[in-house]
Amino acid sequence: MLTSDRGLSEEQRMMRDTCRAFVNDFVTPFIRNNWQREWSMDPKDRLPREILEQAHKIGIRTLGVPEEFGGTPVDPKTEVQTFAMISEEISRGDAGLSDKLVQIWKVSVLLRNIAPRHLQELWFPRIAQDPSFLLSHCLTEPRGASDRWLPYDVPEAMMHTKAELKGDKWVINGRKQFISNGYDAKLYVVYATTKPGAGMTKGTSSFLVPRDTPG
Protein backbone atom coordinates (compact mmCIF):
# COMPACT_ATOMS: atom_id res chain seq x y z
CA MET A 1 0.00 0.00 0.00
CA LEU A 2 1.29 3.45 -0.93
CA THR A 3 1.85 5.36 2.31
CA SER A 4 4.22 8.13 1.22
CA ASP A 5 2.96 11.39 -0.28
CA ARG A 6 6.30 12.00 -1.97
CA GLY A 7 5.82 12.83 -5.64
CA LEU A 8 2.01 12.79 -5.49
CA SER A 9 -0.03 15.72 -6.68
CA GLU A 10 -2.83 17.17 -4.58
CA GLU A 11 -5.32 15.52 -6.95
CA GLN A 12 -3.66 12.14 -6.45
CA ARG A 13 -3.59 12.48 -2.68
CA MET A 14 -7.29 13.29 -2.65
CA MET A 15 -8.09 10.30 -4.87
CA ARG A 16 -5.96 7.99 -2.75
CA ASP A 17 -7.63 9.14 0.46
CA THR A 18 -11.08 8.77 -1.09
CA CYS A 19 -10.27 5.22 -2.23
CA ARG A 20 -8.79 4.35 1.14
CA ALA A 21 -11.97 5.47 2.88
CA PHE A 22 -14.04 3.52 0.34
CA VAL A 23 -12.11 0.35 1.12
CA ASN A 24 -12.14 0.84 4.89
CA ASP A 25 -15.74 1.95 5.22
CA PHE A 26 -17.47 -0.03 2.49
CA VAL A 27 -15.50 -2.75 0.67
CA THR A 28 -13.91 -4.52 3.63
CA PRO A 29 -17.10 -4.60 5.77
CA PHE A 30 -19.12 -5.77 2.76
CA ILE A 31 -16.70 -8.61 2.00
CA ARG A 32 -16.63 -9.72 5.63
CA ASN A 33 -20.41 -9.76 5.85
CA ASN A 34 -20.98 -11.48 2.51
CA TRP A 35 -18.02 -13.83 2.15
CA GLN A 36 -20.31 -16.78 1.38
CA ARG A 37 -21.19 -15.18 -1.95
CA GLU A 38 -17.64 -15.89 -3.09
CA TRP A 39 -18.68 -19.52 -3.60
CA SER A 40 -22.11 -18.87 -5.10
CA MET A 41 -22.79 -20.18 -8.60
CA ASP A 42 -25.51 -17.58 -9.12
CA PRO A 43 -24.33 -15.03 -11.72
CA LYS A 44 -26.07 -12.24 -9.78
CA ASP A 45 -23.68 -12.82 -6.88
CA ARG A 46 -20.45 -12.55 -8.86
CA LEU A 47 -20.12 -8.81 -8.49
CA PRO A 48 -22.60 -7.11 -6.15
CA ARG A 49 -24.16 -4.04 -7.73
CA GLU A 50 -23.86 -2.22 -4.39
CA ILE A 51 -20.08 -2.13 -4.68
CA LEU A 52 -20.12 -0.88 -8.26
CA GLU A 53 -22.64 1.81 -7.36
CA GLN A 54 -20.42 3.05 -4.55
CA ALA A 55 -17.34 2.99 -6.81
CA HIS A 56 -19.37 4.94 -9.35
CA LYS A 57 -20.47 7.45 -6.74
CA ILE A 58 -16.90 8.36 -5.77
CA GLY A 59 -15.83 8.58 -9.42
CA ILE A 60 -13.25 5.80 -9.67
CA ARG A 61 -15.23 3.65 -12.12
CA THR A 62 -15.04 6.24 -14.91
CA LEU A 63 -11.43 7.40 -14.62
CA GLY A 64 -10.64 6.64 -18.26
CA VAL A 65 -13.81 8.24 -19.63
CA PRO A 66 -13.40 11.80 -21.00
CA GLU A 67 -14.87 14.48 -18.77
CA GLU A 68 -17.11 15.73 -21.60
CA PHE A 69 -18.96 12.40 -21.46
CA GLY A 70 -19.30 12.35 -17.69
CA GLY A 71 -16.00 10.75 -16.72
CA THR A 72 -13.74 11.66 -13.82
CA PRO A 73 -10.96 14.06 -14.91
CA VAL A 74 -7.39 12.83 -14.42
CA ASP A 75 -4.13 14.64 -15.16
CA PRO A 76 -2.90 12.95 -18.38
CA LYS A 77 0.73 13.40 -17.34
CA THR A 78 0.27 11.19 -14.27
CA GLU A 79 -2.66 9.07 -15.43
CA VAL A 80 -0.84 5.73 -15.40
CA GLN A 81 0.57 6.39 -11.93
CA THR A 82 -2.90 7.36 -10.71
CA PHE A 83 -4.41 4.15 -12.09
CA ALA A 84 -1.71 2.08 -10.38
CA MET A 85 -2.13 3.91 -7.08
CA ILE A 86 -5.90 3.47 -7.02
CA SER A 87 -5.66 -0.16 -8.10
CA GLU A 88 -3.29 -0.81 -5.21
CA GLU A 89 -5.66 0.81 -2.73
CA ILE A 90 -8.68 -1.16 -4.00
CA SER A 91 -6.69 -4.42 -3.97
CA ARG A 92 -6.15 -3.98 -0.27
CA GLY A 93 -9.88 -4.56 0.15
CA ASP A 94 -10.50 -6.99 -2.70
CA ALA A 95 -8.16 -7.87 -5.58
CA GLY A 96 -11.05 -9.05 -7.74
CA LEU A 97 -12.76 -5.67 -7.51
CA SER A 98 -9.51 -3.96 -8.46
CA ASP A 99 -9.22 -6.14 -11.56
CA LYS A 100 -12.81 -5.33 -12.55
CA LEU A 101 -12.08 -1.62 -12.40
CA VAL A 102 -8.73 -1.93 -14.19
CA GLN A 103 -10.47 -3.51 -17.20
CA ILE A 104 -12.91 -0.58 -17.35
CA TRP A 105 -10.01 1.88 -17.29
CA LYS A 106 -8.01 -0.01 -19.94
CA VAL A 107 -10.84 -0.22 -22.43
CA SER A 108 -12.00 3.34 -21.74
CA VAL A 109 -8.51 4.63 -22.53
CA LEU A 110 -8.48 2.60 -25.76
CA LEU A 111 -11.81 4.10 -26.77
CA ARG A 112 -10.62 7.57 -25.87
CA ASN A 113 -7.33 7.30 -27.77
CA ILE A 114 -8.19 5.36 -30.94
CA ALA A 115 -11.95 5.00 -31.42
CA PRO A 116 -13.61 7.28 -33.98
CA ARG A 117 -15.78 10.05 -32.61
CA HIS A 118 -19.12 8.42 -33.45
CA LEU A 119 -18.23 5.34 -31.39
CA GLN A 120 -17.15 7.49 -28.46
CA GLU A 121 -20.46 9.34 -28.62
CA LEU A 122 -22.31 6.02 -28.73
CA TRP A 123 -20.58 4.22 -25.87
CA PHE A 124 -19.07 6.69 -23.41
CA PRO A 125 -22.44 8.06 -22.20
CA ARG A 126 -23.64 4.51 -21.52
CA ILE A 127 -20.47 3.65 -19.65
CA ALA A 128 -20.62 6.84 -17.60
CA GLN A 129 -24.30 6.58 -16.69
CA ASP A 130 -24.66 2.88 -15.81
CA PRO A 131 -22.77 1.78 -12.66
CA SER A 132 -23.05 -1.87 -13.73
CA PHE A 133 -21.54 -1.27 -17.19
CA LEU A 134 -18.35 -3.36 -17.31
CA LEU A 135 -15.82 -3.53 -20.13
CA SER A 136 -13.60 -6.39 -21.25
CA HIS A 137 -10.33 -6.70 -23.16
CA CYS A 138 -10.29 -9.95 -25.21
CA LEU A 139 -6.74 -10.82 -26.22
CA THR A 140 -5.74 -14.18 -24.72
CA GLU A 141 -6.37 -17.34 -26.75
CA PRO A 142 -5.76 -21.02 -25.92
CA ARG A 143 -2.38 -20.91 -27.68
CA GLY A 144 -1.01 -17.57 -26.48
CA ALA A 145 -1.56 -14.22 -24.86
CA SER A 146 0.01 -10.79 -24.49
CA ASP A 147 3.46 -12.09 -25.43
CA ARG A 148 2.32 -11.81 -29.02
CA TRP A 149 2.96 -8.08 -28.85
CA LEU A 150 6.66 -8.69 -28.24
CA PRO A 151 8.96 -7.60 -31.09
CA TYR A 152 8.92 -10.82 -33.09
CA ASP A 153 6.34 -9.73 -35.63
CA VAL A 154 6.06 -13.01 -37.52
CA PRO A 155 2.94 -14.61 -39.04
CA GLU A 156 3.25 -17.64 -36.76
CA ALA A 157 2.51 -15.44 -33.73
CA MET A 158 -0.75 -14.05 -35.10
CA MET A 159 -4.19 -14.49 -33.59
CA HIS A 160 -6.09 -17.64 -34.44
CA THR A 161 -9.28 -15.63 -34.08
CA LYS A 162 -10.06 -14.21 -37.52
CA ALA A 163 -12.40 -11.53 -38.82
CA GLU A 164 -13.71 -11.42 -42.39
CA LEU A 165 -15.69 -8.68 -44.05
CA LYS A 166 -18.81 -10.19 -45.60
CA GLY A 167 -20.91 -7.58 -47.31
CA ASP A 168 -21.09 -4.67 -44.88
CA LYS A 169 -20.55 -6.76 -41.74
CA TRP A 170 -17.51 -8.23 -40.05
CA VAL A 171 -17.82 -11.90 -39.08
CA ILE A 172 -15.49 -13.01 -36.26
CA ASN A 173 -14.62 -16.65 -35.62
CA GLY A 174 -12.29 -17.97 -32.95
CA ARG A 175 -11.78 -18.63 -29.26
CA LYS A 176 -10.71 -16.44 -26.36
CA GLN A 177 -10.06 -17.52 -22.77
CA PHE A 178 -9.04 -16.18 -19.35
CA ILE A 179 -10.86 -12.94 -20.14
CA SER A 180 -11.30 -10.59 -17.18
CA ASN A 181 -14.92 -9.40 -16.90
CA GLY A 182 -15.74 -11.97 -19.59
CA TYR A 183 -18.93 -13.16 -17.89
CA ASP A 184 -20.20 -9.76 -16.87
CA ALA A 185 -19.13 -7.14 -19.42
CA LYS A 186 -21.58 -5.31 -21.66
CA LEU A 187 -18.96 -4.32 -24.24
CA TYR A 188 -15.86 -6.21 -25.39
CA VAL A 189 -12.76 -5.22 -27.34
CA VAL A 190 -11.94 -8.32 -29.41
CA TYR A 191 -8.63 -8.68 -31.24
CA ALA A 192 -8.70 -10.68 -34.47
CA THR A 193 -6.55 -11.31 -37.53
CA THR A 194 -7.76 -9.40 -40.58
CA LYS A 195 -4.65 -9.71 -42.78
CA PRO A 196 -3.26 -13.26 -42.50
CA GLY A 197 0.48 -13.42 -42.96
CA ALA A 198 1.05 -9.72 -42.30
CA GLY A 199 2.28 -10.11 -38.72
CA MET A 200 0.65 -8.89 -35.52
CA THR A 201 1.23 -5.17 -35.85
CA LYS A 202 -0.15 -4.87 -39.39
CA GLY A 203 -2.50 -7.82 -39.55
CA THR A 204 -4.53 -7.45 -36.34
CA SER A 205 -7.65 -5.35 -35.84
CA SER A 206 -9.69 -4.56 -32.75
CA PHE A 207 -13.48 -4.76 -32.76
CA LEU A 208 -16.06 -3.41 -30.34
CA VAL A 209 -18.50 -6.24 -29.69
CA PRO A 210 -21.64 -5.59 -27.60
CA ARG A 211 -22.71 -8.38 -25.27
CA ASP A 212 -25.95 -9.01 -27.15
CA THR A 213 -24.21 -9.54 -30.52
CA PRO A 214 -25.53 -12.76 -32.14
CA GLY A 215 -23.15 -15.70 -32.16
Residue ranges with predicted function:
Residues 161-164:
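A structural signal for short hydrophobic beta-strand segments in well-ordered beta-sheet cores
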